[in-house]
């Protein structure tokens, strides 16, 4: 029943405004092709309060961390990582590097088929022209064994630059992403 005009229908939207419960809007999605070593999101609109990347990834060789760069800039990135695997915890820091390094986010190519690393990456104040850009990542992967680099990680980083972010390049230590890899960029209202 339409609340606007009283029309009866099997569709709950007949005569009513569409209902959109999400604060997230899809901007772009990329899927690995087995040969690309970098995936770039370009022409990012400056109309959101922040950005979120949702990642499921696997490398064709080796594994462990996503590298991230903004606007093609190769300087001014600092990252801190805390990771654990159930037996031990590790803390790492990288200062003034050419990338943000986000650990525990890319599954190893030697692991069982269809095992992927998962990560949620939040990019704050991306459209600001007065603030440096901060990033938070929660990631994990598990091969159900005692393999190296499995576990969970919390990473935080900063790009020391006040430019608005209009492109994001994602890599993985120089190796390519498999065809099962997906990166989805969302704008947060």
Regions found by a protein language model. Give the residues of each.
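Surface-exposed molecular-recognition determinants
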Residues: 2-189
